[in-house]
Every structure is written in C-alpha cells, then in structure tokens.
C-alpha cells in the first residue's frame, strides 16, 4: 500500500569477480548501508551494460535499500544528493520505491527505531547466515502507521537537522 516497487538483488552468479571494473555503475554492499542515508564512500563497479542487464537490481535516488542476508537491520535511502544516479544492489539486499503516500526518508527513519527494527527483524532466521525469510513478501506485509505527508516532512526535517549536526560533530572530533 506504500510501495510502488520492490525487488531483490541479483543472483550471486550474475555478478562474478571478473565483472568488476575500475569505473562504471557502483555496486552496493553492507558498508554502504551504515546510516540513514547511503554511505557513498567506497565501491566496486560494473559496466553500464552489466548494470542494464541486471534490470530491477538497479537502485536510483529516493529508493531505499535493505540488507536481507548477513548483517540484518541495515536500511538506507539513496538521497537526491548521492554521488551517482544509479547503483546495483547486491545479492544480499532488496530495494523498494515508495509511492506518494510516504517519504522514503520517513520510512527509513522508522526502520531505524526500536519498533521498526523489531518489525523488520521479526521473521529473521539465525540458522547459518542470518536472513529474513521471504524478505520482500514479508516486508510488504508489515503494517506501519504513517502520518500524513505534511507531518512526515516535519518529522524528517527534525531528524535530518539532528543527523547533519552529528555528522559535523564527528568530523570535528576526527580532526582534533
């Protein structure tokens, strides 16, 4: 009811070691999903042609990316200010695009709360590699209370201002 589109990452065999090149379309991994917004620092790349062949495994600005296998609970949105217009998600991720009823930033912030993490991880399997069972199906069935869009904008603005202040403080501390 809140999503326009949701899709899994490619099968592992679709991105082999020999597919990586020096520049091109960045491939996301867990280190890129360490906060609310995508961490644009470090990537491996595939060619434009390879990315095109992966179809729905391409994520774009305003999409939200979720880890469904491995380090569970990671969820980040791709901001309009990201370094790249598109990315390829990994085999351990899925991505979704929100419809007009919900801001991707709002939903991402929600899933970073204790309640949101509980909801997200409620169908996790800890046998072997941690994974979300039927990740996209389960995710679509989650019930999330969403305020109206005006209220979402207000909430996101508060959190974004706080997040930006934290980033500045971290940079200051790192330079001491």
Each language-model region and where it sits:
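A generic structural signal for short beta-strands and their flanking turns/coil linkers
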Residues: 24, 42, 90-92
